[in-house]
Amino acid sequence: MRKALTAALILVLTAAASAGLGQQKAPDPLERLARLYEESRYFELRDAVARMKDHSSLEMEFFRGAVDEVFNLLDSAVSRLQNYVHSAEKGPARMMTKEAWVLLADAFRRSGRYREAAEARREILDRFGSVLGKEEKDNCENQVGLWSALADIPPQEVEVGEDMTIRMTNRQFPVRVKGRTFFVGHDTGSNLSILYKSIADELDVAIYGPAIKIQTGTGQWIDGRTGVVPEMRLGSIIIRNAVFLVLPDEFFPSAAARFGVDRRGLLGAPVLEGFKEITETKDGDLIIPASPRPRFEQNMCFSGFMPVVQVLFRGARLSLCLDTGSSATYLYPPFFRRYRGEIVSRSKPRKSTMGGVGSSVTVPIHVLDEFGFRAGGKDLSLRKIAVHTEVTHTDTRYFHGTLGLDILAQCSRMTLNFESMSFILE
């Protein structure tokens, strides 16, 4: 649906300029903003919007709201986007209005305003259902069911009373619920935290709503149930009203063998964002400060709950997802298309099997001998990097790749600050 945004905006601009037919006009900068948005080039969009601070059109209210939403200024985003949809109800730019509702739904979800998230998704179905593709419509209906079921659940709260340094065992650490201690990992690539069904049953976790479908990193769709844990403790940190996706244990058959501990779940992006800042060290510590200090480089944003970081490659600005659940860095079709000639001339096509939650998939790839880039303030060089040539899931359609934990081999620590939206490597 994003591909219709530029066309919709051009119709608006054409109508507005109809009195000037026959006169040659300079390209309208709003068209560039629309292209940056639909291509998920959020860092360039932010900078372009900032340069248009004196522009006061209704369309600018949409783009300012979009920038606020992806850079985690949720109160401002909601205000701007609500102003846009209310003002544009009778306007012609229907695809922009639809995108505004998508961003509003996401802002409500990340704020823990689940009832409003469901209402925004329902608005999309009611107003635009006839023009949605099947996958997008199914996903929207799925989210209406999910957030409607959680409508009466209070927003998640995280209480960090003191600086915490947690010694991990193979990147797993103990949490406590109802007096029961078990191990979990952490995964910024997971839109919801995860509990295995066995521990959810043991803890009598309350389940809300019907089964929902989620898309895994391999592009496969799996069924899960939604549960809420009223209180979980990580050392002295208290996590309240955390939403978990409850999945069958058989989706994680090798957890104990891989990690050497009895892992029963994952803390996903909503809980990690609630910590405000996390630092993972090469030596295996997870550091969570009580009061994160301000950071000055805004080089990270959100796509949904997925952190996206800015990467410099040969002077070009790329956007890569940051997935702490991925052991390796991958490059995706947008990168392949941009550098196709060079990649094809230097490597032969091959197949690779990717594992994910509950499934695996074989994908066509090329392999780069070396990928040198700058991220988080540090120059990095990775060898034998797979370049996916076909789209397998949503992130592979819009972003240049995924940064995995192999970058930690060249750093002492990695910090994600969700207040300043900063990604820092040291």
Regions found by a protein language model. Name each.
Residues M1-A4:
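Positively charged n-region of N-terminal signal peptides that target proteins for export
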Residues A7-A16:
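Bacterial N-terminal signal peptides
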Residues G20-E426:
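Pepsin/retropepsin-fold aspartyl endopeptidases
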